């Protein structure tokens, strides 16, 4: 895939195989010294390498025959084929609305006519979702065309066009251990792998190998979109270390199907993403991923109600309002809702949906004291009639000035699988991109990859999995900015800080006239005609930093900034 633009900078080099970028990572260290809070700006020099060649990517879905699996497969096929269909409201055309990379934009910089926006996907060379190759497993034997019909998600005219393609697709048998999911799933389980746990893991590994061999893909990413499981206890000697987990599988001890799939994927060198709320990544699974330098990510796709919660809570707390009560009610009628009607499976979902507000509460000690947080209640009910059209109702009550109260009530109708499917694509595309990014600091001898626990995926997950000791961030825009700014760093570009100082001065320090360099040499395909790259004269960056020459600046009597 050719780059849609090029960065003209002595700090960025477009080599044959990689984009090499020098980047200054600026942070702020805060510490206490003799009763004074000191603030010290810090800068670390990085060099990023991003491989330019985009691989042929295979995606294996656990639960391929479910609502999500059939919908995302159908969506990719429909986009690849350029399908359109009629509904009662008119003609519809296949698209990827809801995908961060395919349907949202980022500000590249400023040009002669203002800010220049490009599709998120064009920042770095990325896999085109139309080129994805799908395979997977399911405990149900239906081919994907019949499973798509059972799901009742897509319009009938579209299903008719897709049937000739999808009826040829049939999931591989999957692992079924009844005690981990609701008993009401038994009637689907006619397509299972038999044998010991060790034999089942070996069969999954053989399936991955077979898919690689027969499809000709360069990489495989495995994604769990099957039923929500109950939580597993962390048991010393069973799943607390990588070696104990492997022994537990050999000895047939308690290991969940999702963890078994994760182990098989890791041993095959394939990234594994958990799209459900259960604790798939027990300590032993995380250690195994780190040992094999394989990416893992999760947990639980963030699509509807929880995504809104991560935005609204961020808004309320950032505005200085104090949310004191959050009540979230859902009812849905798809198989996910059916499985979640069992108490143990619901508990897994309740935990992932409840923790989404924690970091925003902890960010404001003015509003919340130690151990104080809003009352937070989550309810999910199964109502078969509504199918995949999930209803979500939320009530947010906040304390406002002088003892007042503010209540916000939302009603949200979520087409569950149509919201989740674009997130699948973003997860696998971002994971694959991260596999092609390496970096080092000025003191490192060798380049390194991201940590095996791929926390950059947090934007797409309800309960972000992060490396030990890492802060968990749920706030929507902080998560999105993290992805955008890391990708900008790979191009040697400063983070977007939205200061726009050049427009806030009587005498601007930067000329907004067209630069002498022909910026139109790099047209942006998403716009009519030629676009321009954002222009910054030499020596000027988005982040403006200078010293007053005194060595330190005193902000107040007890806070100092050291330059």
Curated annotation (Swiss-Prot):
SUPFAM superfamilies: Glyceraldehyde-3-phosphate dehydrogenase-like, C-terminal domain (SSF55347), NAD(P)-binding Rossmann-fold domains (SSF51735). Its EC number is 5.5.1.4. It is found in: Cytoplasm. It is an enzyme of class 5 (isomerase). Pathway: Polyol metabolism; myo-inositol biosynthesis; myo-inositol from D-glucose 6-phosphate: step 1/2. It catalyses: D-glucose 6-phosphate = 1D-myo-inositol 3-phosphate. The keyword Coiled coil does not apply. GO terms for molecular function: inositol-3-phosphate synthase activity. GO terms for biological process: inositol biosynthetic process; phospholipid biosynthetic process. One of its GO terms (cellular component) is cytoplasm. Its cofactor is NAD(+). Keywords: Cytoplasm, Inositol biosynthesis, Isomerase, Lipid biosynthesis, Lipid metabolism, NAD, Phospholipid biosynthesis, Phospholipid metabolism. Key enzyme in myo-inositol biosynthesis pathway that catalyzes the conversion of glucose 6-phosphate to 1-myo-inositol 1-phosphate in a NAD-dependent manner. Rate-limiting enzyme in the synthesis of all inositol-containing compounds. Belongs to the myo-inositol 1-phosphate synthase family. This is Inositol-3-phosphate synthase 1-B. It comes from Xenopus laevis. The lineage of its organism: Eukaryota, Metazoa, Chordata, Craniata, Vertebrata. The gene is isyna1-b.
């Amino acid at each position: 895939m050719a780059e849609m633009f090029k960065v003209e900078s002595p700090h960025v080099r477009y080599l044959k195989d990689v984009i090499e970028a020098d980047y200054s990572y600026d942070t702020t260290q805060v510490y206490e010294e003799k009763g004074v809070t000191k603030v010290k700006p810090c800068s670390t020099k990085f060099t990023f390498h991003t491989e330019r060649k985009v691989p042929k990517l295979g995606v294996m879905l656990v639960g391929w025959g479910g609502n999500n699996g059939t919908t995302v497969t159908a969506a990719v096929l429909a986009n690849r084929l350029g399908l359109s269909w009629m509904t009662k409201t008119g003609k519809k055309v296949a698209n990827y609305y809801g995908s961060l990379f395919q349907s949202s934009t980022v500000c590249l910089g400023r040009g002669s006519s203002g800010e220049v926006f490009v599709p998120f996907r064009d920042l770095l060379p990325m896999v085109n979702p139309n080129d994805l190759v799908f395979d997977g497993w399911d405990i149900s034997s239906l081919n994907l065309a019949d499973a798509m019909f059972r799901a009742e998600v897509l319009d009938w005219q579209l299903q008719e066009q897709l049937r000739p393609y999808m009826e040829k697709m049939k999931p591989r048998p999957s692992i079924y251990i009844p005690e981990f999911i609701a008993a009401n799933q038994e009637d689907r389980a006619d397509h299972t792998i038999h044998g010991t746990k060790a034999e089942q893991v070996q069969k999954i590994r053989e399936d991955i190998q077979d898919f690689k061999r027969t499809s000709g893909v360069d990489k495989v990413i495995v994604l769990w979109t099957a039923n929500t499981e109950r939580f597993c206890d962390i048991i010393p000697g069973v799943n607390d270390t990588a070696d104990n987990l492997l022994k537990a599988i050999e000895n047939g001890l308690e290991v969940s199907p999702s963890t078994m799939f994760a182990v098989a994927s890791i041993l095959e060198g394939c990234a594994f993403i958990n799209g459900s709320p259960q604790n798939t990544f027990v300590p032993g699974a995380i250690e195994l991923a780190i040992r094999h330098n394989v990416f893992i990510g999760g947990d639980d796709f963030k699509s509807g109600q929880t995504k809104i919660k991560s935005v609204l809570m961020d808004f309320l707390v950032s505005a200085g309002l104090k949310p004191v009560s959050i009540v979230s009610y859902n009812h849905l009628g798809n198989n996910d809702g059916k499985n979640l009607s069992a108490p143990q499976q619901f508990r897994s979902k309740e935990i992932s949906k409840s923790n989404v507000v924690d970091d925003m509460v902890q960010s404001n000690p003015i509003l919340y004291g130690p151990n104080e947080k809003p009352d937070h209640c989550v309810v999910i009910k199964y109502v078969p009639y509504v199918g995949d059209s999930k209803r979500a109702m939320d009530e947010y009550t906040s304390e406002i000035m002088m003892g007042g109260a503010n209540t916000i009530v939302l009603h949200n109708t979520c087409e569950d699988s149509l919201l989740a499917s674009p997130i699948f694509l973003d997860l696998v595309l971002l994971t694959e991109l991260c596999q092609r990014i390496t970096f080092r600091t000025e003191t490192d001898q060798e380049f390194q990859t991201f940590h095996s626990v791929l926390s950059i995926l947090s934007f797409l997950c309800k309960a972000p999995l992060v490396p030990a000791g890492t802060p968990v961030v749920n706030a929507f825009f902080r998560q999105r900015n993290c992805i955008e700014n890391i990708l900008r760093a790979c191009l040697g570009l400063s983070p977007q800080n939205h200061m726009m100082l050049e427009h806030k001065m009587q005498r601007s320090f930067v000329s907004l006239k067209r630069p002498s360099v022909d910026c139109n040499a790099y047209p942006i395909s998403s716009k009519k005609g030629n676009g321009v790259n954002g222009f910054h004269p030499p020596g000027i960056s988005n982040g403006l930093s200078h010293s007053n020459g005194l060595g330190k600046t005193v902000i107040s009597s007890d806070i100092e900034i050291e330059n």
